[in-house]
């Protein structure tokens, strides 16, 4: 079924849109952007900051908007005050190619935060991250039902970062 908003549009209509996650901070958006850029080994930059308007309810001594890039993905950090907090309902997944990259990124992001189940962590700002080896998705698509069950069991029993060799061994049986 075609959604009503798409009725009458050609099926091959190309949309030149970009998804830009907006992250709501109390007042640490600029600090968080710099922290994330450092965690990604400098693979990012602060694009722009926008000062708070005098009539805005946002904090006046920090930028209200901090636009930044991480690994080619654009984000917006908003210093909007304490009314909203991050939760696990939304997480950022970073797919890494090997254990060294996983270990380095994990250590940088979990610093001041906490380890969570299933390869997740919560950073010091409360934002949830999944640091996932690309091998995980390869194992899921290449394995049979028994291999996938073993892999999922290994994932569900993990608290903290993934050990790629352990996931591979679980999938192999």
Mark where each language-model region is:
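Vicinal oxygen chelate
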Residues: 2-16, 45-48, 69, 76-79, ...
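Core segments of cupin and vicinal oxygen chelate
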Residues: 11-13, 22-72
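Short, well-ordered beta-strand elements within core beta-sheets of diverse protein domains
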Residues: 21-24, 91-97
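Intrinsically disordered, low-complexity acidic/polar segments
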Residues: 30-32, 77, 86
């Amino acid at each position: 079924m075609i959604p009503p908003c798409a009725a009458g549009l050609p099926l091959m209509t190309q949309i030149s849109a970009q998804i830009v996650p907006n992250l709501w901070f109390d007042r640490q958006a600029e600090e968080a952007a710099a922290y994330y850029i450092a965690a990604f080994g400098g693979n990012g930059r602060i694009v722009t900051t926008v000062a708070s308007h005098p009539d805005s309810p946002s904090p006046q001594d920090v930028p209200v908007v901090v636009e930044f890039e991480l690994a080619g993905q654009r984000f917006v950090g908003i210093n909007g005050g304490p009314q909203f907090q991050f939760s696990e309902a939304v997480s950022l997944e970073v797919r890494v190619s090997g254990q060294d990259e996983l270990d380095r990124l994990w250590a940088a992001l979990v610093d001041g935060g906490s380890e969570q189940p299933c390869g997740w962590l919560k950073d010091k700002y409360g934002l949830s991250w999944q640091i996932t080896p690309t091998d995980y998705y390869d194992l899921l698509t290449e394995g049979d039902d028994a291999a996938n069950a073993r892999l999922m069991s290994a994932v569900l029993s993990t608290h903290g970062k993934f050990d790629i060799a352990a996931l591979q061994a679980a999938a192999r049986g």
